[in-house]
């Protein structure tokens, strides 16, 4: 009896196996059919310029400076290859390519200006669509010493630079004034020199001139005869004349 039941058991097992295999085949065919239908719908939308706009969001809206954040760009079109591009204002940041779904962009907020706005662009063939703007909110943390230091450091450097420039200007002005005084002193000294030279030349000329010849006179005394004066007087006057001979 056992031998008689064996074919029936084998046939039942083989029937279940075939049925399981057929179920898997049917499920696989159904999945392929749905995928092809979705792809056809997406391609039809693309051909009809019906590319949906992407959505840009983040898991956190309030951030601090120096914090790492992520932005997710997603679209309803999931069956075609899509190029996702991220923009900060009008500045291009990064691009990623995948078949539909969503992509994540990782950023680091270094200053308050990097809070936004951000945009995501999807590109399929010759079609493109932009997402809405997204902005982060900067948290006001008063207990952040590094933040205060980053704000004070530029002002401190600017103050040091101004002091250095003022000192350099004063030193240059003092040096220029001293140089001008030295030039004036030199010009005065050069102005007195010709007068001294002239006096020296005159003195030399006076000393080098030939001395004048000195002539000596020798007196010669002669006795002259007395002369009578008119009017008649008895007195006689004797006169002695002399001549100088050189």
From Swiss-Prot:
It is a single-pass type I membrane protein. Expressed in myeloid cells (dendritic cells, macrophages and neutrophils but not in T-cells, B-cells or natural killer cells) and mast cells (at protein level). It comes from the Eukaryota. Residues 1-33 form the signal peptide. N-glycosylated. Disulfide bonds join 73-120. The chain crosses the membrane at residues 151-171. This is Allergin-1. It comes from Mus musculus (Mouse).
């Amino acid at each position: 009896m056992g031998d008689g039941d064996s074919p029936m058991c084998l046939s039942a097992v083989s029937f279940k196996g075939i049925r399981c295999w057929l179920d898997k085949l049917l499920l696989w065919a159904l999945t392929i059919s749905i995928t092809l239908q979705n792809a056809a719908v997406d391609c039809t939308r693309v051909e009809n310029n019906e590319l949906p706009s992407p959505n840009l969001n983040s898991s956190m809206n309030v951030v601090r400076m120096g914090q790492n954040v992520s932005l997710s760009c997603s679209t309803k079109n999931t069956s075609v290859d899509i190029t996702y591009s991220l923009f900060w204002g009008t500045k291009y940041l990064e691009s990623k390519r995948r078949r539909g779904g969503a992509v994540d962009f990782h950023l680091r907020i270094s200053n308050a200006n990097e809070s936004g706005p951000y945009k995501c662009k999807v590109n399929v063939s010759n079609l493109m669509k932009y997402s809405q703007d997204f902005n982060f909110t900067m948290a006001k943390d008063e207990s952040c010493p590094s933040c205060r230091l980053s704000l004070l450091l530029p002002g401190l450097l600017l103050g040091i630079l101004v002091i250095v420039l003022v000192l350099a200007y004063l030193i240059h002005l003092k040096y220029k004034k001293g140089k001008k005084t030295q030039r004036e002193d030199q010009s005065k000294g050069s102005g007195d020199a010709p007068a001294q030279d002239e006096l020296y030349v005159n003195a030399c000329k006076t000393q080098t001139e030939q001395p004048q010849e000195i002539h000596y006179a020798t007196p010669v005394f002669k006795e002259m005869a007395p002369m009578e004066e008119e009017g008649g007087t008895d007195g006689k006057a004797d006169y002695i004349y002399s001549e100088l001979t050189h």
